[in-house]
Amino acid sequence: MGAKTSKLSKDDLTCLKQSTYFDRREIQQWHKGFLRDCPSGQLAREDFVKIYKQFFPFGSPEDFANHLFTVFDKDNNGFIHFEEFITVLSTTSRGTLEEKLSWAFELYDLNHDGYITFDEMLTIVASVYKMMGSMVTLNEDEATPEMRVKKIFKLMDKNEDGYITLDEFREGSKVDPSIIGALNLYDGLI
């Protein structure tokens, strides 16, 4: 699929239909919109960040958008192609809870080693706080990114080894309604 700018082939449509929660018509509509916004058939990092700035004018979304871009860009070529875009959109908007949790874990696992360290989570949480700016009033026990991450680690890092595995992340997320709520927020952030 890559940087094609024409209609999707039947094979491409079939493949995307099998690997996403969208039907053929929806895939074609998303593809048409993607090409309208990205005539080259790909979305560069700087353009992705610009789009995020439009959605969060009262905050600074650059850091979060850059982290998010990395999760989208599966082939690490510096661009988001339609297949990458529609796959993430499918997972975040229509995926199962388990799929959404795996996707969120991938966002936090910055070095892709299968674990989330305190610093990795702090990086993402701080970027979310910066992005939201003055739009959100925080609880006193989550007034800073550090406080939020300490609270999350206390909940999730059951064996207190300093990092969170995918299983710990899944289990901890299921008992904290705010995390499930945040996963549903991603529906609107992407």
UniProtKB/Swiss-Prot annotation:
Residue positions binding Ca(2+) 1: D73, D75, N77, F79, E84
Main location: membrane
GO CC, alphabetical: cellular bud membrane; cytosol; Golgi membrane; intracellular membrane-bounded organelle; membrane
Annotated Pfam families: EF-hand_7, EF-hand_8
InterPro entries given in the database record: EF-hand-dom_pair (IPR011992), EF_Hand_1_Ca_BS (IPR018247), EF_hand_dom (IPR002048), Recoverin (IPR028846)
Positions where lipid (N-myristoyl glycine) attaches: G2
Location in or out of the cell: Bud membrane
Binding site for Ca(2+) 3: D157, N159, D161, Y163, E168
UniProt-listed GO biological process terms: regulation of signal transduction
Residues of the EF-hand domain: 24-59, 60-95, 96-131, 144-179
Record has Metal-binding as a keyword: yes
Source organism superkingdom: Eukaryota
Membrane topology per record: Peripheral membrane protein
Effect noted on mutating G2A: Abolishes N-myristoylation
Binding site residues for Ca(2+) 2: D109, N111, D113, Y115, E120
Record keywords: Calcium, Cell membrane, Lipoprotein, Membrane, Metal-binding, Myristate, Repeat
Gene Ontology molecular functions: calcium ion binding; enzyme activator activity
Assembly with partners or alone: Binds PIK1.
Protein's job: Regulator of phosphatidylinositol 4-kinase PIK1.
Family membership: Belongs to the recoverin family.
Additional detail: Binds 3 calcium ions via the second, third and fourth EF-hand.
Protein name per Swiss-Prot or TrEMBL: Calcium-binding protein NCS-1
Gene: FRQ1
